[in-house]
């Protein structure tokens, strides 16, 4: 078997390792942020860290092992990656509104962010 016929175990190792580190850090900072204070702002940031970490985990799987997956599996993993990154950005927007409104969230803001997310998808 020649060198060109061998399949790599991980196809994009640096990108995958970076994504896996982001997953670990996202989980750590998510847990840490949730334990800080009992506020809506910190709750939203904690959720955002967890969601971004999970998106990074899926991105690392896709970048590292994606060529071994079927076309459908690749699309599903990448779609879920983008969904989790989008949810994370919406959480950050929501935390901004919570900060501006003295730790409270208006239903109108949630509806606007929901439709904004639908445009993203």
Q: Where in this protein do the model-derived segments appear?
A:
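Hydrophobic alpha-helical transmembrane segments of multi-pass membrane proteins
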Residues: 18-22, 44-66, 88
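Membrane-interfacial loop-to-transmembrane alpha-helix junctions, especially the N-terminal start
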Residues: 38-52, 103-112
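Aromatic-anchored segments of alpha-helical transmembrane domains
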Residues: 54-55, 113-121
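Juxtamembrane/transmembrane-helix boundary motifs in multi-pass membrane proteins
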Residues: 6-10, 38-39, 73-74
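Hydrophobic transmembrane alpha-helical segments in integral membrane proteins
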Residues: 2-24
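Long, amphipathic alpha-helical coiled-coil segments characteristic
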Residues: 17-37
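Internal transmembrane alpha-helix with an interfacial aromatic "cap," most often the third helix
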Residues: 27-34, 59-108
């Amino acid at each position: 078997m020649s060198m060109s016929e061998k399949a790599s175990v991980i196809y994009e190792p640096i990108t995958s390792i970076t994504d896996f580190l982001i997953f670990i850090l996202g989980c750590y900072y998510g847990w840490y942020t949730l334990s800080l204070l009992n506020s809506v702002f910190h709750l939203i940031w904690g959720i955002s860290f967890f969601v971004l970490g999970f998106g990074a985990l899926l991105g690392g799987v896709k970048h590292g092992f994606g060529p071994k997956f079927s076309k459908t599996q690749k699309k599903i993993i990448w779609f879920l990656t983008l969904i989790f990154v989008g949810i994370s950005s919406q959480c950050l927007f929501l935390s901004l509104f919570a900060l501006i409104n003295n730790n409270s969230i208006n239903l109108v803001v949630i509806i606007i962010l929901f439709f904004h997310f639908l445009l993203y998808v």
